[in-house]
């Protein structure tokens, strides 16, 4: 459980993570780690460490671009994808944003595709994939730079599942 959860201290551009219980269609209650305000390599890895430390049987991450990295953007996004693929504790990573798309293309050209790391072009696609893949008891981390607007994917996920009961 998350009884001992404490958000990471507010330093170095992170610390806005909020943990909450959410309920999707079919009464699927899960834990949301919502940190969709900011993302840089330090805060991204710290958020993933928080996700890894949870006791959930399935850990899912919705990850958007890490913006404003300049010349380091490709290498940082590539390193993140390699980390995600190699993380035995991670069930699923859903990627979105232009930087993630480019890194995903490079990664799959080199290593092939897997069901563990997937790319979705829009927040609506992210919401649909989450609705189809999330299960009771999962922990979902949502993390990305502000410009990716991952809160829209969450709003769509919660709106669609709570209003029609059938998901997207």
Model-assigned labels for residue ranges:
Residues 1-168:
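ATP-dependent carboxylate-amine ligase
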């Amino acid at each position: 459980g998350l009884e001992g959860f404490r958000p990471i201290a507010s330093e170095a551009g992170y610390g806005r993570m909020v943990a909450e219980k959410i309920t999707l269609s079919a009464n699927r209650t899960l834990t949301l780690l919502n940190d969709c305000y900011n993302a840089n390599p330090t805060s991204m890895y710290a958020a993933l460490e928080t996700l890894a430390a949870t006791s959930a049987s399935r850990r899912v991450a919705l990850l958007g671009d890490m913006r404003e990295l300049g010349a380091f953007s490709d290498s940082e996004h590539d390193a993140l994808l390699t980390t995600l693929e190699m993380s035995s504790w991670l069930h699923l990573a859903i990627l979105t944003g232009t930087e993630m798309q480019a890194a995903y293309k490079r990664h799959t050209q080199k290593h092939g595709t897997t069901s563990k790391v997937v790319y979705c072009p829009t927040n609506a696609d992210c919401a649909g994939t989450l609705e189809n893949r999330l299960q009771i008891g999962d922990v979902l981390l949502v993390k990305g730079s502000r410009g990716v607007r991952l809160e829209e994917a969450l709003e769509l996920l919660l709106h669609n599942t709570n209003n029609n009961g059938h998901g997207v």
